[in-house]
């Protein structure tokens, strides 16, 4: 888990009498491109891993530009983000639960044993969450 200081205006919710109103800054893809790489490298270093060892990238698909920013920041191919793109196309950005729809599709497909996956979601405040996954026999 990592939070970016002074980023309350990047992503979140405004609570008004008329209900919840989402806050999405247009700078999110640029922030991801610069901020996500160091965060994920630091996270993977704790496990003596590097991004090239990640077979399955389970990403919350905030939007097409967000997925492109993931690819740029972590040197991923579009193959890594295909399932996230498919979920985005079928359901849109459903907020927090969206990454669980992506995870479900990874769990349903045949994965090679003894491979690693990385679940990544971004959220309000601007924050990032990462979970290391391992597929076993």
What is each model feature region?
Residues 1-34, 38-42, 122, 134-137:
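Condensing-enzyme catalytic core mediating Claisen C-C bond formation in acyl metabolism
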């Amino acid at each position: 888990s990592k939070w970016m200081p002074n980023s309350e205006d990047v992503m979140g919710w405004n609570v008004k009498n008329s209900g919840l109103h989402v806050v999405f800054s247009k700078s999110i893809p640029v922030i991801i491109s610069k901020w996500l790489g160091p965060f994920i490298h630091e996270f993977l270093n704790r496990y003596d891993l590097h991004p090239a060892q990640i077979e399955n990238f389970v990403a919350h698909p905030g939007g097409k530009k967000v997925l492109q920013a993931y690819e740029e920041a972590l040197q991923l191919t579009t193959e890594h983000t295909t399932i996230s793109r498919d979920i985005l196309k079928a359901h849109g950005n459903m907020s927090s639960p969206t990454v669980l729809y992506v995870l479900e599709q990874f769990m349903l497909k045949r994965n090679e044993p003894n491979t690693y996956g990385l679940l990544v979601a971004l959220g309000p405040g601007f924050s990032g969450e990462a979970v290391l996954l391992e597929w076993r026999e």
